[in-house]
Amino acid sequence: MKRIVCIICAAVFALTARAEIRLPAFFADGMVLQQQATVRIWGTAAAGAKVTLTAGWDNRTYTCKAASNGSWALKVKTPAAGGPYEIRISDGEEIVLRDVQLGEVWICSGQSNMEMPVKGFLSQPVEGAFEMILDAGKDNVRAFTVARRLSDTPQADCGGKWVAASAGTVPDISSVAYLFACRLHRTLKVPVGIVVAAWGGFWGGFLPGKLRKRFQKRSAPGYWR
C-alpha cells in the first residue's frame, strides 16, 4: 500500500514539476501581428527551460531561457504583410499557432461609444448594421475583444479570442473599430487586426492606480455640457 502511495505521489510530482508553455490569450490561432516590425512574444514555462520559437514566414528560430519565475519573452522580426503562417513554440513540448496573419494591428479603446457593437445596444440600433453584416467577410479583418474583468492589480493576461470577420462574428464587434478596420483594409490592402478594449462608463479602470487617485476628488466645473 505504501509503495502504491509513493508511486502516485511521484507521478503527481513529475506532472507538476514540468510546467508546460503557456501563452496569453492574445497569442493564438488566427491572430494578426504587426508587419515590418520587431514584435514581442511572451509567456511562461518551467523555470530555466529553454524556449524556442520558429516563425513560419522565414523559418528563423529564436531562443531564450525562462526566468526563475517561469517568464520568458522573445523579440521576433516580421516582414511585409502576408499569411497565413504558423508559429512553433517549444520547450520540448511544442505549441503550434496556426493561421497567423501579418498586417496592421490597432488598439481600439474607450467607453460606450467604442464598446457599442455592430448589433447595437438594447433600443439603440446602429445605422447601417444590416449592410455591414451582409458584407462581412469581404474584408480581411480580425478582431480580439478583451473580456470584461475586474482586478485590483495589473494582470499578465486577459480573456478574449481572435475572430475573423463574418456574418456570425461581426454583430458582436465594436462598430467604430470594425468600420475603421474595414476602411484601413480597403486602403492598404493588407490584413487588419483590431484589439478592442472598451468598457462603458469605466474610464478609471484604464488608468494606473496612482494616477487614478489624482482624479477621484476632482469635480466638474459649474458649467459643462
PLM regions with names:
Residues K2-I8:
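Sec-dependent signal peptide recognition
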Residues C9-R18:
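Hydrophobic h-region of N-terminal signal peptides that target proteins for export
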Residues E20-R225:
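Cell-envelope and extracellular/periplasmic
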